[in-house]
Amino acid sequence: SDSDVPHTRGAAGIGLVRTETAILYDQSDEVQTTRLRELLKSAEGVPVLLRTCDTRADDDAPWAGETQDRLRGNRLFKPQIRALLCAATDGDLRVVFPMIKDVADWDRCVDEVNTCRDELLAEGCETGPMMLGCVVDMPSAAVMAGDMMEHGAQLMAVDIEDLTRYTLGLVQNPTAAVNQLTNP
């Protein structure tokens, strides 16, 4: 119904869409593309801001360790980028990368997007435009935001909770936080 469409309720866009859970259930780029296309079509033209997989070393989620290792090997990141590029033909997709600590990290993400786009085009797949940016969730990203913009970042999404936590050297695990306070 119209009441389920974001812009009929006054929304100028949808975001920030997290992707960790969807990727962990099915990592194939085909399934991810289908889900993303459904999301973009339901948005009916309003921008959708999506954050790529965020697997922190300090995350207590049971999958974090395995996922972190797999991301380093590009086995999760590449299918996600391919799915995003394919789905971008169906709407206004804006993508931010979390845990970018410096310009070199940013450049690696952009290089991977360009590599995936080239591969898809060589395979005869249509790709759509995506506005790219990063999540400012680390102090170094906040300090280097201007440099990243000079390197092509088109938007920044500030994760104030993580930025504050990392700036102050706090931990995410509540038990560890209590231990840190009681046993400095």
Report the location of each language-model feature.
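Conserved alpha/beta-domain cores
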Residues: 1-184
